Amino acid sequence: MKEKIFIMSGLLGSGIASLFGGWDLALQTLLLCMVVDWFTGGILLPAVFQKSLKSENGALESRAGFKGLCRKGMVLLVVLIAARLDLLMGTRYIRDGVCIGFIANEMVSIMENAGLMGIPLPEMIKKAIDLLKDKETT
């Protein structure tokens, strides 16, 4: 029974990885950044530091967490579509470019979370965060 579960898990995992264009460094890095951002912004900031920007009192809020997970799911759908476009066009750079763009966005969010936790950030990172915040409001 255990062997069947392992086989089915392997088949499912490889099928999903194949849909996303393979289990390469770009996808692994994006998923790692997404998990770190979710953990730091969705768990640590509200639960430990009470400094979440997504809730009124800075604490954990299930609705904010659900919306964040929905956004992460949408990012993965965009990567999936980019991988399919690569297949359609016989290229290899569309999905990688999409992954790199989302990785950069996740990294800025992780740095913002670190700043809210009191970790000193380089001035360049602070300016990048401010620039992205300005874009969100306009």
Q: Where do the protein language model's features map onto the residues?
A:
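Canonical alpha-helical transmembrane segment with a positive-inside/aromatic-interface signature
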Residues: 107-138
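Mid-chain, well-packed structural core segment of small domains
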Residues: 66-103
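A cytosolic-side transmembrane-helix exit/cap motif
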Residues: 46-60, 113-124
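Juxtamembrane helix-capping/reentrant segments at transmembrane boundaries
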Residues: 51-75
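Hydrophobic alpha-helical transmembrane segments
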Residues: 4-8, 27, 31, 73, ...
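Alpha-helical transmembrane segments of multi-pass membrane proteins
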Residues: 30-41, 75, 79-83, 101-109
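Short, strongly hydrophobic alpha-helical membrane anchors
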Residues: 1-20
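Helix-coil boundary and interhelical linker segments in multi-pass alpha-helical membrane proteins
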Residues: 16-27, 85-94
